[in-house]
Curated annotation (Swiss-Prot):
The active site is at D65 (proton donor/acceptor). The gene is mgsA. Its EC number is 4.2.3.3. Residues 1-126 form the MGS-like domain. It comes from Rhizobium meliloti (strain 1021) (Ensifer meliloti). It comes from the Bacteria. One of its GO terms (biological process) is methylglyoxal biosynthetic process. Catalyzes the formation of methylglyoxal from dihydroxyacetone phosphate. GO terms for molecular function: methylglyoxal synthase activity. Belongs to the methylglyoxal synthase family. It catalyses: dihydroxyacetone phosphate = methylglyoxal + phosphate. Keywords: Lyase. This is Methylglyoxal synthase.
Amino acid sequence: MADRKCLALIAHDQKKDDLAAFAKANEAVLSKWKIVATGTTGGRVLDVCPALDIVRLKSGPLGGDQQIGALIATGDVDCLIFFVDPLTAMPHDVDVKALMRLAIVYDIPMALNRATAEQLIDFRRN
């Protein structure tokens, strides 16, 4: 399955459990993807879905967001799911904006909440 599409997963602290629940509910579909994730988010998803193929990068505030951004810029990420917490101020908010900008510049689909993520993986199922 070397030609699998690559999905990037990121979640703010208050949304990590939501992303893990999303992954568990969609584990069969996600198993068809190569997944990259920021460190803590990837760990949380692996806790509930240990069979998924997830490459864990650095934690978001330590550069994981930038690592995913670099993968987007090199064409190595096909879709981005980023569960954003809009109610909590983030000291690294500029990283979020940078990822959104890269998703737009490189024209990859990006979901910011579960409803959109469900639609994205359903659409990309084939």
